[in-house]
């Protein structure tokens, strides 16, 4: 049973070819946008790689980049075919590439869907990766002399200033770690000794945050040391006053930032998917309607176009049989070539 059959006069085929040409180049433009958005997300993930536990989130930009690149190539091909369809002799050169094109176009649509699914599915993975990565970044903040962690302090300070955030979930995350290196502590000082002895793990903990947590918009000089001690600062109440440090955690800030980029990527991929599907359907109609035209004399004849010549199940079975036959013929040719080589030796 033929699915979605339609009759095409010469004028309708011309309009179909023109529409396909327009859709093809729109698909190329959107493919370029999708490719660029994927590259941008990839770069942003790479920039903050030090505060992430793993790189599983990179699957999203990788898929988006693939979808954009394939969309560009298929759009260019479809545009060339639409131009060649006005000349039977030129069109004959493209006919043999039609089935591989349809196969790749369907794969491209599936890649677009995969990119959309990954954008949603990997949000939880990204959040967990940021949670662990930021926790480690805060813990290793002081290790500026340790190989592999030399730039951890710079990365964390830049992150907190750029995203106006402090700590992992909140500024108190800094209270739980020793973020000042021992090389900068005066161990002859009674205050330092008492603070280290008061801690079970022998760490120098204090209710303070790095300078990068300070809010420069605050009219008051930044209170970054002894934050919870009201008596240490004039006219200050930790419980009721608005703190002049950033109170939002960096995990929330980064997750919100990446979620926004992924949403934009999702919109670009969705548009790319719709255009590629439209190009696929239009080219299929053009191909099947041109299939019965054998020469220039038949160009103005009325023809029929369709999406599938048989039902979905029958088409899939036929395609599988063709692929199986092609695979078997390749095996036979390989075996014959091996036998001839053995006989010659």
UniProtKB/Swiss-Prot annotation:
Residue numbers on the Cytoplasmic membrane side: 1-24, 81-99, 291-345
Topology in the lipid bilayer: Multi-pass membrane protein
Listed InterPro entries: Peripherin/rom-1 (IPR000830), Peripherin/rom-1_CS (IPR018498), Peripherin_LEL (IPR042026), Tetraspanin/Peripherin (IPR018499), Tetraspanin_EC2_sf (IPR008952)
Keyword Cell division: no
Stretches that traverse the bilayer: 25-43, 62-80, 100-123, 265-290
Topology, Lumenal side: 44-61, 124-264
GO cellular component, one term: plasma membrane
Expression tissues: Rod specific.
GO biological process: visual perception
Domain of life (superkingdom): Eukaryota
Compartments where found: Membrane
Subunit structure, as described in the record: Homodimer; disulfide-linked.
Family membership: Belongs to the PRPH2/ROM1 family.
Protein name in UniProt: RDS/peripherin-like protein xRDS35
Organism: Xenopus laevis (African clawed frog)
Upper lineage: Eukaryota, Metazoa, Chordata, Craniata, Vertebrata
Gene from which the chain derives: rds35
């Amino acid at each position: 049973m033929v699915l979605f059959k339609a009759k095409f006069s010469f004028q309708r085929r011309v309009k179909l070819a023109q529409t396909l040409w327009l859709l093809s180049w729109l698909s190329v433009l959107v493919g370029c946008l999708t490719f660029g958005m994927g590259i941008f997300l990839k770069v942003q993930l790479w920039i903050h790689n030090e505060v992430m536990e793993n790189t599983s989130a990179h699957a999203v930009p990788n898929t988006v980049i693939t979808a954009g690149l394939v969309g560009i190539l298929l759009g260019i091909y479809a545009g060339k075919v639409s131009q060649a369809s006005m000349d039977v002799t030129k069109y004959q050169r493209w006919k043999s590439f039609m089935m591989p094109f349809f196969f790749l176009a369907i794969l491209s649509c599936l890649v677009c869907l995969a990119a959309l699914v990954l954008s949603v599915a990997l949000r939880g993975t990204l959040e967990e990766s940021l949670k662990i990565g930021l926790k480690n970044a805060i813990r290793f903040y002081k290790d500026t002399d340790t190989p592999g962690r030399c730039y951890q302090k710079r990365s964390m300070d830049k992150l907190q200033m750029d995203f106006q955030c402090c700590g992992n979930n909140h500024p108190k995350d800094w209270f739980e770690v020793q973020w000042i290196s021992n090389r900068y502590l005066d161990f002859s000082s009674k205050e330092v000794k008492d603070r280290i002895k008061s801690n079970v793990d022998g760490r120098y903990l204090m209710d303070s945050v790095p300078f990068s947590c300070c809010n420069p918009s605050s009219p008051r000089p930044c209170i970054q040391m002894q934050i919870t001690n009201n008596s240490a600062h004039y006219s200050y109440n930790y419980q009721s006053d608005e703190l002049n440090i950033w109170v939002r955690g960096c995990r929330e800030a980064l997750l919100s930032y990446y979620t926004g980029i992924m949403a934009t990527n999702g919109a670009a991929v969705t548009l790319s998917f719709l255009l590629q599907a439209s190009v696929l359907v239009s080219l299929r109609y053009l191909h099947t309607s041109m299939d019965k035209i054998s020469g220039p004399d038949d160009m103005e004849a009325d023809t029929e176009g369709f999406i599938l010549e048989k039902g979905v199940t029958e088409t899939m079975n036929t395609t599988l049989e063709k692929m199986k036959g092609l695979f078997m013929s390749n095996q036979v040719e390989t075996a014959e070539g091996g036998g001839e080589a053995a006989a010659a030796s």
